């Protein structure tokens, strides 16, 4: 991930970008935050850091803290914190032999808003996304495939 090229890459994709710096980050020496405005009017705020040589981590999405190494295949769920959601997701992926490499769960409070972020070893088909959405009652389920150029 070359952040120096971010404005150029954004411009090439017809995206608007602004860069601001703040020398005060209480938890991380190097922190990059991106706020994206989606076509439907929603926004997402993602923060990442560099922990060491080529050791990037996603450390927050919106107001929820994480510690997740970005890989090629990521799955994100937003849902109300309740027992059983992690099990449903694991079982659903396991039935299709999709291996979970890493998982992080963040929540605002017990029973509050929650975010599950997973790295998996293979692409997740759209029909499985629909099954997970239905069985967990999640308000959002997104599979993200990061491809290096």
For each predicted feature, which ranges?
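A conserved regulatory-domain signal marking ACT and ACT-like small-molecule sensing domains
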Residues: 1-149
């Amino acid at each position: 991930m070359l952040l120096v090229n971010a404005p150029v890459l954004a411009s090439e994709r017809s995206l608007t970008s602004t860069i601001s710096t703040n020398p005060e980050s209480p938890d991380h020496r190097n922190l990059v935050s991106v706020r994206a405005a989606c076509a439907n009017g929603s926004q997402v705020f993602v923060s990442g850091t560099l922990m060491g040589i080529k050791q990037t981590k996603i450390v927050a999405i919106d107001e929820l803290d994480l510690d997740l190494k970005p890989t090629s295949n990521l799955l994100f769920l937003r849902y109300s914190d309740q027992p059983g959601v992690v099990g449903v997701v694991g079982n659903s992926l396991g039935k299709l032999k999709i291996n979970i490499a890493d998982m992080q769960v963040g929540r605002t409070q017990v029973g509050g808003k929650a975010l599950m972020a997973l790295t998996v070893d293979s692409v997740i088909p759209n029909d499985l996304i629909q099954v997970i959405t239905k069985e967990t009652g999640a308000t959002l389920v997104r599979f993200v495939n990061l491809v290096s150029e």
